[in-house]
Design a protein with these regions (language model features):
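Generic structural signal for helix capping and beta-alpha/helix-loop junctions
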Residues: 16, 47, 129, 178-180
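Surface-exposed, active-site-proximal loop segments in enzymatic domains
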Residues: 83-93, 130-140, 185-187
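Alpha-helical packing segments of well-folded alpha/beta enzyme cores
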Residues: 99-106, 155, 159, 202, ...
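Short, well-ordered beta-to-alpha junction loops that form the rim of enzyme active sites
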Residues: 123-126, 173-175
Length: 253
């Protein structure tokens, strides 16, 4: 049985998304009877490095035989690209023009492989600079954070621009979180990575974008019959009807 798939491609914020309360785990639970949610998160990665591993993350054999195009791929990079070039994480920094070019190339790669696949971009989140100093990375003796909220904002704007130019849906996470006055403490556990509340926002925003492109529990059929589709007097009968029965009509709420 080949279930349709949704891929999550990104950095540590994606890699951690299958942890308890993570947005990826929530997506997997949400689509548990309709699609497989596949994690492809790589801590510390930027778009430059993502470009180098595209053919390994999405190998050619995915197109062979009964391979189906993914329903959707989320592309969630930028937090590391936006590292400042004169601080401890300079090796992760990618200039903003190159970041935009790389996002364009990633979207083009995926759409050329699978024209029907929905590619959803997600901007980097905001940065709580005070919290970053409390959770130092490398620059133990520095009073300067390796990331700033201004830089994150610029990369988020660039991501939104690329999405518009590509005609792709986008979750503007930077702007969404800024709608709440206590976003730093509420949504970022260390000034960068997500709290449970932050994961909830990403989940809700991604679900919303998936619905906009027609991917929801209402539109995707269930993989196998639900128990309330079964006749208590002849429960096996439903399996004979599998090729024609739309099981999502019978789902237990």
């Amino acid at each position: 049985m080949m279930r349709p798939k949704i891929y999550l491609f990104g950095d540590s914020i994606t890699e951690e998304s299958f942890s308890a309360g993570g947005w990826g785990a929530a997506l997997a639970h949400h689509f548990s009877r309709t699609a497989d949610v596949v994690l492809r998160g790589f801590s510390g990665y930027n778009t430059r490095w993502a470009m180098k591993v595209l053919d390994k993350v999405f190998p050619a054999e995915m197109n062979v035989g009964n391979g189906r195009a993914p329903l959707a791929v989320t592309v969630f990079f930028g937090a590391n690209d936006a590292c400042l070039p004169d601080r401890c994480s300079a090796f992760q920094h990618v200039p903003i023009d190159e970041y935009s070019q790389n996002l364009h190339a990633i979207v083009a790669y995926l759409k050329n492989r699978w024209p029907s696949t929905h590619v959803i971009l997600i901007t980097p989140p905001p940065i709580d600079e005070v919290a970053r100093l409390l959770h130092r990375y490398g620059e133990i003796h520095s009073d300067l954070p390796e990331r700033t909220n201004e830089a994150a904002r610029n990369y988020a704007k660039a991501c939104v621009t690329v999405a518009r130019e590509c005609g792709a849906p986008v979750v503007d996470l930077w702007s969404r979180m800024h709608q709440f006055p206590d976003w730093g403490k509420a949504y970022l556990r260390d000034g960068l990575h997500l709290t449970l509340g932050g994961n909830k926002i990403v989940f809700e925003e991604v679900i919303g974008k998936l619905k906009e492109v027609g991917l929801s529990l209402e539109t995707l059929p269930a993989d196998l019959p639900f128990t309330d589709a079964m006749d208590p007097n002849d429960p096996l009968k439903v399996f004979d009807q599998m090729p024609t029965t739309d099981f999502k009509m019978f789902r237990v709420i």
